């Protein structure tokens, strides 16, 4: 079984207290947080049908956590291709286009001589010192592009955000632009993150290649190493246009990627890089590994695991692995393995084909840099403008877009695969699931004469969380854990009445989107639905606002929800609210109406 986030440690009293007594807390079970360097164990599906369902969810999960569910509008690329340099057997040009309005993707286009149609390859570079210009014995991005072009492929190498011609945006926190860091908790609320932007850039890079008349649109591959390997397998998982994939030195069960651009908040709550890569099956996948990095066990561990996924399709010959005796790399031996793989699957070469690399000499940097001798075009957005444009576009989609996708995005933000169905109530009288610190509320509940289970929320260790790199990629936030705890409580008690106040009241409304709640009394503590600051303070869950937050949850909830203490900044269409604070007398009246004594 997969090593995963321990099951929600919601701990409840095992029996109902007598009337007039205070429901007893239980001691919450402590647990170990997940990290990017845990050893993950792959859980394999029992059947192809089961895997198709899981793979579809994972594909959607990548998009949702990346802020791409619903998918952003594919606005015009406005591509500019210029500065072509012609060599004997290939050409290279400078390229920029807009993946979002005013947000540029920059890179180089390498083409074979001739008119095509040619197969094509998108080639993200990874965390080499010189990005797409890296040209060393360890890795050469222009070297692989030149050789692939000579072999008859159109190749687009493009910058990761913050590298080379994209340098006006920072790649990691601490590298500032306009005196602020790019990305952060507010951006996370809206699904705007570095990894998601780079995934979108990769998707739009495929759009760019498809727009070229010389490209065979049904024969597009992807390859990159290190962080470029992460970009490769994420793109390959979500974009059906990728016909062959070769992530290099990245697929591992004991290191999931060390950069912010590989760690989308919420992505790996219950998955790992092997399973994410397996979503590509049964399309042809080459796993290139090295003896000197975290892929050193590929031939004994990750490759056999991947073969089992391909076996479900009867397509074991569509996955292959090689291990190079070297440290972390995309060196000549690794590149030659990729050349052969792409030749086989994109050009119809025999399975035993060998393709040797030819000597190459990249053009001087000024001839490859997009903005070496021309100014940045007018209209390029700053990080602040990018954030505000992203939020405005998200609001438009929430107002008139695909509501099914929005609802799915909420489930992904909360870390659940699907809405649960209602179970049968176990007794003639409902059970109360109680989450309050208000003694008056507890006394009112006790007077109702109903069985009570008081939620003991999983403790959140903020100090331990802060010490874990990319914590939110692998673990729920404190608010997210509260929601999960309530979902578990309600799932175990069909027909229960939920009573919750304060932050638990907010979590209760979100839980009602996941598990059927027939009746709930929620005090939301005058929460301001219009304020990002309020979400950051009381309900920080990455992707929550991108998915319509509590408004989407209320639309998904099917029971009778009574919302109190809403104030004047808590308006949800179709949901009645009460401005006043919830009182014990009101609770008692409702409980008697709903089945109390």
How would you name each of these model-derived features?
Residues 6-16:
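Bacterial N-terminal signal peptides
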Residues 20-104, 281, 288-451, 458-494, ...:
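Alpha/beta-hydrolase-fold serine-hydrolase catalytic core, especially in secreted/extracellular enzymes
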Residues 110, 125, 158, 223-225, ...:
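Generic beta-strand/beta-sheet core signal
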Residues 113-211, 250-261, 434-492, 527-538:
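Cap/lid segment of the alpha/beta-hydrolase catalytic domain
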Residues 133-140, 174-178, 189-200, 222-233, ...:
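Alpha-helix capping and helix-loop boundary segments enriched in small/acidic/polar residues
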Residues 204-269, 489-555:
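Primarily recognizes the serine-hydrolase "nucleophile elbow" in alpha/beta-hydrolase
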Residues 223-262, 266, 270-313, 318, ...:
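Catalytic-domain carbohydrate-binding cleft regions of carbohydrate-active enzymes
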């Amino acid at each position: 079984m997969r090593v995963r986030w321990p099951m929600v440690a919601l701990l409840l009293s095992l029996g109902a207290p007598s009337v007039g007594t205070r429901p007893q807390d239980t001691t919450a079970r402590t647990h170990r947080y997940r990290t990017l360097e845990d050893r993950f164990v792959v859980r394999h599906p029992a059947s192809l049908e089961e895997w198709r369902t899981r793979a579809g969810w994972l594909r959607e999960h990548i998009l949702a956590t990346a802020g791409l569910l619903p998918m952003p509008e594919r606005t015009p690329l406005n591509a500019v291709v210029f500065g072509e340099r012609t060599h004997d057997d290939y050409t290279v040009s400078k390229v920029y286009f807009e993946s979002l309005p005013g947000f540029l993707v920059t890179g180089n286009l390498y083409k074979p001589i001739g008119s095509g149609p040619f197969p094509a390859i998108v080639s993200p570079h990874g965390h080499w010192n010189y990005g797409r210009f890296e040209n060393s014995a360890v890795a050469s991005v222009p070297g692989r592009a030149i050789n692939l072009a000579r072999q008859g492929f159109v190749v687009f190498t493009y910058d990761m955000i913050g590298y080379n011609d994209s340098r006006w945006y920072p790649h990691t926190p601490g590298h500032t632009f306009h005196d602020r860091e790019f990305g952060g908790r507010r951006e996370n609320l809206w699904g705007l993150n570095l990894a998601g932007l780079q995934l979108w850039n990769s998707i739009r890079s495929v759009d760019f290649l498809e727009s070229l008349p010389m490209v065979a649109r049904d024969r597009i591959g992807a390859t990159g190493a290190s962080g470029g390997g992460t970009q490769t397998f994420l793109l390959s998982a979500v974009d059906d246009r990728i016909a062959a994939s070769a992530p290099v030195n990245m697929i591992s069960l004991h290191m999931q990627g060390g950069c912010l651009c590989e760690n989308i908040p919420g992505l790996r709550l219950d998955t790992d890089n092997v399973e994410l890569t397996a979503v590509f099956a049964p399309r042809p996948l080459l796993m290139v590994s090295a003896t000197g990095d975290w892929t050193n066990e590929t031939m004994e561990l990750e490759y056999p695991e991947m073969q089992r996924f391909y076996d479900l399709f009867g397509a074991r010959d569509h996955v292959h692995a090689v291990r190079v005796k070297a440290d972390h790399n995309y060196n000549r031996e690794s590149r030659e393995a990729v050349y052969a793989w792409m030749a086989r699957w994109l050009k119809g070469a025999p399975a035993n084909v060998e393709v040797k690399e030819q000597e190459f000499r990249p053009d001087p940097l000024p001839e490859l840099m997009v903005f070496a001798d021309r100014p940045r075009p007018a209209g390029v957005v700053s990080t602040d403008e990018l954030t505000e444009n992203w939020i405005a576009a998200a609001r438009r989609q929430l107002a008139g877009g695909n509501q099914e996708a929005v609802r799915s995005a909420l489930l992904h933000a909360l870390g659940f695969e699907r809405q649960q169905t209602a179970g049968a109530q176990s007794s003639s009288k409902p059970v109360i699931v109680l989450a309050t610190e208000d003694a008056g509320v507890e006394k009112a509940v006790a007077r109702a004469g109903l069985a009570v289970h008081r939620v003991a929320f999983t403790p959140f260790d903020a100090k331990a969380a802060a010490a874990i790199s990319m914590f939110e990629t692998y673990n729920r936030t404190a608010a997210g854990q509260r929601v999960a705890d309530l979902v578990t409580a309600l799932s175990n008690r069909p027909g229960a009445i939920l009573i919750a106040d304060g932050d638990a009241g907010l979590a209760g409304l979100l839980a009602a989107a996941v598990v059927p709640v027939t009746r709930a009394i929620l005090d939301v503590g005058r929460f301001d639905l219009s304020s990002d600051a309020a979400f950051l303070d009381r309900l920080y869950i990455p992707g929550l606002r991108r998915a319509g937050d509590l408004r989407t949850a209320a639309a998904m909830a099917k029971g009778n929800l009574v919302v109190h203490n809403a104030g004047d900044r808590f308006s949800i269409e179709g949901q009645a609210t009460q401005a006043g604070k919830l009182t014990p007398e009101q609770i008692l009246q409702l409980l008697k109406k709903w089945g109390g004594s």
